[in-house]
């Protein structure tokens, strides 16, 4: 659950993770293969704080890679605080609720390329995990993995197919092979 809160004179997003909403076995695969978290013991009692730390770490990586995403502010146990993407009236809409054009498509593909160039794969990219507020922002990054993860290639392929299918439904001509080639281009 994500809430809007006030810090000083600015809005922030406060994301609270609950064990009841996290499926231990399904998220374990995103942590165990990620070398950045290889020294962390993972059991049912520790999974939520590890998942929060993983999202914070991935947000930091995207900030360093200049990929638009909420700026991480801090975390504690099951709580993550980050910059708020939206206005006084409400949060920025998910991409699924935005009028889509080729410029938005280009921003998404460019963001995927920047992530890949910085050895990051979102691993759950879809129209639900991107916001639009003057530009595209990538969100929900706890499952994002480093390129050394044994399933990184599979996750990247799934992201490419999801993105391609979404934009095709909105009349944008896409080709997963060309997307893959562009993302991996040095």
Swiss-Prot record:
Keywords: ATP-binding, Hydrolase, Kinase, Magnesium, Metal-binding, Nucleotide-binding, Serine/threonine-protein kinase, Transferase. GO terms for molecular function: ATP binding; hydrolase activity; metal ion binding; protein serine kinase activity; protein serine/threonine kinase activity. The keyword Kinase applies. Pfam families: RIO1. Despite the protein kinase domain is proposed to act predominantly as an ATPase. PANTHER family: SERINE/THREONINE-PROTEIN KINASE RIO1 (PTHR45723). It catalyses: L-seryl-[protein] + ATP = O-phospho-L-seryl-[protein] + ADP + H(+); L-threonyl-[protein] + ATP = O-phospho-L-threonyl-[protein] + ADP + H(+); ATP + H2O = ADP + phosphate + H(+). PROSITE patterns: RIO1. The active site is at residues 124, 140. Belongs to the protein kinase superfamily. RIO-type Ser/Thr kinase family. This is RIO-type serine/threonine-protein kinase Rio1. InterPro entries: Kinase-like_dom_sf, RIO-type_Ser/Thr_kinase, RIO_dom, RIO_kinase, RIO_kinase_CS, Tyr_kinase_AS. The keyword Secreted does not apply. ATP binds at residue 15. Its EC number is 2.7.11.1, 3.6.1.-. SUPFAM superfamilies: Protein kinase-like (PK-like). Mg(2+) binds at residues 129, 140. It comes from the Archaea.
């Amino acid at each position: 659950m994500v809430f809007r809160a006030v810090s000083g004179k600015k809005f922030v997003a406060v994301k609270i993770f609950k064990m009841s909403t996290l499926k231990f076995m399904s998220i374990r695969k995103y942590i165990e293969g990620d070398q950045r978290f290889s020294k962390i013991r993972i059991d049912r009692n520790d999974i939520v704080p590890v998942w929060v730390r993983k999202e914070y770490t991935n947000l930091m990586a995207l900030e360093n890679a200049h990929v638009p995403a909420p700026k991480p502010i801090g975390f504690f146990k099951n709580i993550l605080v980050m910059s708020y993407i939206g206005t006084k009236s409400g949060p920025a809409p998910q991409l699924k609720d935005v009028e889509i054009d080729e410029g938005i498509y280009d921003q998404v593909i460019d963001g995927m390329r920047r992530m890949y160039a910085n050895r990051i794969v979102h691993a759950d990219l879809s129209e639900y995990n991107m916001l639009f507020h003057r530009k595209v922002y990538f969100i929900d990054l706890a499952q994002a993995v480093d390129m050394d993860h044994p399933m990184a290639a599979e996750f990247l392929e799934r992201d490419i197919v999801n993105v391609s299918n979404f934009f095709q439904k909105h009349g944008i001509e896409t080709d997963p092979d060309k997307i893959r080639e562009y993302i991996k281009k040095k």
